[in-house]
């Protein structure tokens, strides 16, 4: 089930985007995956997909040392620049759960997905076409699997009812959102890889959950989902979101990415 919580004001979102842009030298290019490539006889273009922050599903799954390196370098920056938004997020979720919520200090802090060009440039036509395709994988969130050793340091850990959340900071002109399905699937098969043959196995119809700027969307557990592609994208469109996960450890929700 999808839950919605108004989290940031318009002013907050504008301030956050400005800070994200000012940190663009720290953006990590994630466009190397083939599904983000536009290829013809003349060139191969990479659609602009970046993250600000270390990411379990991109870094730790491929190279745990890279995840550790990124989080060690970027966590202090994120805390310095975005501690105020972490306080808001924790406060909002504490109201939702009636339980303590903290930013975990050991794992990577919640960060940003950035589907956009850097300030001063616009999306090229081939990028617009790519972003109107379903680039995101159909998957369930199992990022916690990358950190089993850490979870074992706590007495009680709930890895069934884990938290995933997204907060849109900027959205394309015609919006964005999340597809979800009710199907119960094998996480090993419905992971972060390509979508080949996945949709053929699903019995339930997809549900379109449209985003609202500044409004958190979150869910608990292994909900099957996929990033919705763009619609009638414009060269100046941007899709910037805060992303994070949470695990309840010894009665405290610990947020990470």
Can you describe what each PLM-predicted range is?
Residues 1-84:
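N-terminal auxiliary "cap/dimerization" subdomain that precedes the catalytic jelly-roll/cupin core
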Residues 55-132, 150-151, 157:
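Signature of the catalytic double-stranded beta-helix
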Residues 110, 161-163, 167, 215, ...:
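Residue-level detector of short, conserved catalytic/binding motifs and their immediate flanks
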Residues 115, 165, 219-221:
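Short His-Asn-centered micro-motif
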Residues 116, 182-184, 246:
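Residue-level signal for short segments within beta-strands and strand-turn junctions
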Residues 122-210:
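Catalytic core of non-heme Fe(II) oxygenases with the double-stranded beta-helix
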Residues 190-257:
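Catalytic core of Fe(II)/2-oxoglutarate
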């Amino acid at each position: 089930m999808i839950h919605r919580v108004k989290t940031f004001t318009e002013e907050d979102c504008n301030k956050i985007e400005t800070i994200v842009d000012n940190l663009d030298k720290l953006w990590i290019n994630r466009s190397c995956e083939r599904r983000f490539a536009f290829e013809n006889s003349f060139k191969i273009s990479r659609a602009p997909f970046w993250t600000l922050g270390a990411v379990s599903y991109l870094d730790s799954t491929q190279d745990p040392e890279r995840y550790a390196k990124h989080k060690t370098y970027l966590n202090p920056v994120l805390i310095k620049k975005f501690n105020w938004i972490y306080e808001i997020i924790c406060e909002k979720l504490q109201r939702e759960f009636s339980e303590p919520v903290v930013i975990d200090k050991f794992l990577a802090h919640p960060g940003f997905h950035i589907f956009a060009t850097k300030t001063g440039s616009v999306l090229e036509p081939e990028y617009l076409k790519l972003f109107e395709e379903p680039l995101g994988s159909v998957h369930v969130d199992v990022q916690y699997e990358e950190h089993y050793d850490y979870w074992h340091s706590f007495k009680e850990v709930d890895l069934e009812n884990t938290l995933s959340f997204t907060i849109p900071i900027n959205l394309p002109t015609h919006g964005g959102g999340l597809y979800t399905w009710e199907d119960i699937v094998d996480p090993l098969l419905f992971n972060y890889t390509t979508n080949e043959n996945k949709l053929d196995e699903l019995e339930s119809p997809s549900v379109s959950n449209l985003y609202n700027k500044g409004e958190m969307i979150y869910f608990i557990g292994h909900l099957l989902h996929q990033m919705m592609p763009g619609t009638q994208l414009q060269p100046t469109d941007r899709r910037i979101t805060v992303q994070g996960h949470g695990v309840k450890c010894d009665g405290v929700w610990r947020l990470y990415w």
